[in-house]
């Protein structure tokens, strides 16, 4: 890596690892995109630090398996150690798995659908200060509206903005961050 300090939000071990290896790096793997979408949804009202600490509990979120879940499977998942104990969010994961598979079938892959919003090229905001980072933008509002029309839940524009960053469609590394140019 070049000189400079990493983005200041990355403070804990989990945050630093996520920042250095995933955040704002283009992802075109459907399974990873689904996992990230669910992590972002589960994060609503919680800290990203907590989600990253409990990420291992989400690692088996396979959309094809989740799409077939009923109430018994949801209850069993909620009883598992490390999982965020929120029925609404757990049920949402099942709903989103079904919607995710429908989009993947329509577009050939979920990645193809997602990346069409940016014509396959990450948006680089070239941020100079942390306070310049928006919580949402026009792109996240458009993607959010379309996902909702397709039956997804917990996909408001703020969650979608974070998702687009995490999936690498938006590069919001500060220009002074050594990871700014990675993946562009």
Model-inferred region functions:
Residues 1-184:
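HhH-family (HhH-GPD) DNA N-glycosylase catalytic core used in base-excision repair
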């Amino acid at each position: 890596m070049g000189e400079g300090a990493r983005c200041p939000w990355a403070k804990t071990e989990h945050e630093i690892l996520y920042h250095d290896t995933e955040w704002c790096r283009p992802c075109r793997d459907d399974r990873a995109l689904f996992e990230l979408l669910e992590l972002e949804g589960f994060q609503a009202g919680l800290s990203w630090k907590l989600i990253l600490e409990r990420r291992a509990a989400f690692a088996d979120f396979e959309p094809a398996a989740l799409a077939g879940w009923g109430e018994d499977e949801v209850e069993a998942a909620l009883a598992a150690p490390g999982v965020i104990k929120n029925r609404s969010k757990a049920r949402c994961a099942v709903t989103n798995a079904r919607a995710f598979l429908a989009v993947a079938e329509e577009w050939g892959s979920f990645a193809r659908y997602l990346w069409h919003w940016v014509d396959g090229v990450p948006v680089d905001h070239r941020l100079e200060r942390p306070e310049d980072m928006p919580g949402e933008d026009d792109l996240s509002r458009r993607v959010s509206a379309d996902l909702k029309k397709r039956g997804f839940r917990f996909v408001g524009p703020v969650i979608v903005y974070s998702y687009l960053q995490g999936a690498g469609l938006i590069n919001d590394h500060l220009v002074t961050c050594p990871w700014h140019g990675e993946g562009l």
